[in-house]
Regions:
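Secreted, disulfide-rich extracellular signaling modules
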Residues: 1-157
């Protein structure tokens, strides 16, 4: 773990229940939008699962996103108002798929109130304590299908 690239990211990330691996994300790219005047209309986090990695062992049926602020971890605000997504959708023999999250409120809050230290999030299996399900994810440095934060935004007059 000491050899992980915390600046450029990794090509592969892992998630596993029963006290196993979690994935930490930093949304440092959002810093460029601070004080820009842009308004985020919709934000979606897409986390692709490496094709074929969940044939032998099932992937978690859904993931949760926690905001990390020092040693405190809390569910992001989007979970308090309806379904933010995070369910695994797959197709084909090799179970190619992705987790998709609606994170609009969280991104808006970060841009409005957050300091840059709060741009850190953690992906965890929804039933972390009771399920051994695991997944191999495409990391942010994956050349073919990286994790992505898709933003739809406008600049008011």
């Amino acid at each position: 773990m000491a050899t992980q690239d915390t600046v450029l990211g990794e090509s592969t990330a892992h998630i596993q229940g029963l006290g196993g691996a979690v994935t930490v994300l930093r949304l440092d790219g959002l810093k460029t939008l601070l004080d820009s005047g842009y308004v985020v209309n919709y934000a979606e986090l897409v986390v692709p699962v490496r094709e074929g990695s969940n044939v032998r062992y099932a992937a978690p049926s859904s993931l949760s996103i926690l905001q990390v602020n020092g040693s405190t971890k809390t569910l992001i605000r989007d979970y308090l108002r309806g379904n933010p997504g995070g369910t695994f959708t797959a197709s084909g023999v090799l179970r190619k798929g992705a987790y998709r999250f609606v994170v609009t409120r969280h991104v808006q809050d970060l841009l409005r109130y957050g300091d840059t230290a709060s741009f850190k999030m953690m992906l965890v299996p929804e039933r972390m304590a009771s399920s051994p399900a695991r997944a191999v994810l495409h990391g942010s440095a994956d050349a073919v299908e990286p994790m992505s934060l898709n933003l739809w935004y406008t600049k008011p007059n």
